[in-house]
Amino acid sequence: MCRFFAPKPDLSLISKGFNLQPNKPNVRILGPMLRPQFHPDAWTPKGTHVIAYMRTSVLHHLPAISQHADVHGLKLKLYGHYPETVPDNVECCPISNEGFIQDMLTADWMIQTAGTQLLGEVGCIGIPSICIPEPGQVEQEINAALANKTFPHVEVLHPKRTSIEELDAVLSRISTHSDRPMIKDGSEEALLMIDDFLSSAVNNSSTSPTSGILLETEERGNSSLN
């Protein structure tokens, strides 16, 4: 829909959690749109639970993940999609912004499908995280590979090898003590760029009409201003 209303935007703002270079002169790569609760010192694990954000296509990994958590004396808090049969140590959590944030900030580690926004938050707070991209989701596979290369506390789980031993092996490769890139909140920068763009557009409206701005974030969709 945004491409329909703004097929050739004068300015494109793309939110990513990685230090990427734009490939067009009218494109700007911004940091993730961080929620206020996320900052570098926000992660405070309590030794009580693991958090998972999963969708139907990757739920076959759940038994091994829940068993691993159980062996280590942890509850598994599950967000997203749920299976018909839920292991005893799994708590199916309803969709809740505040609940998810609190559980994420206090979890020992997390597992997720490598969405851009969530990976940006993971990169910001430094929580150990395992990515399981959904089958056929090329963007998630790219996100997972970039996150694994960028952050010492992010690993990728092989889609066909899920066991307690494999999870132990993956988690053993994660480092929470190594230096990691500083993730900047992209929301303020986005607002400043939009304000500058609109001010310039107003000043030049009599001679140079603009086609709009395209702001791209994965989980929150695309937004256009024209």
Task: Name every feature range the model reports, one short phrase each.
Residues D168-N226:
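C-terminal amphipathic helix plus adjacent low-complexity
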Residues L34-R35, G80-P83, S96-E98, E134-E139, ...:
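Short, acidic/turn-prone active-site loops that include or flank metal/cofactor-
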Residues H81-G123:
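Donor nucleotide-activated moiety binding/catalytic core segment of transferases
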Residues C2, I65, F100-I101:
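Acidic, amphipathic alpha-helical patches
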Residues L11-L13, R28, K77, C93, ...:
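Hydrophobic/aromatic beta-strand patches that form the interior of the parallel beta-sheet core
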Residues M54, P63-P94:
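Catalytic donor nucleotide-activated moiety binding site of glycosyltransferases and closely related
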Residues M1-V58, H81:
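A nucleotide-sugar donor-handling region in carbohydrate enzymes
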Residues L118, G123-T176:
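Catalytic binding pocket for nucleotide-activated donors in carbohydrate/polymer assembly enzymes
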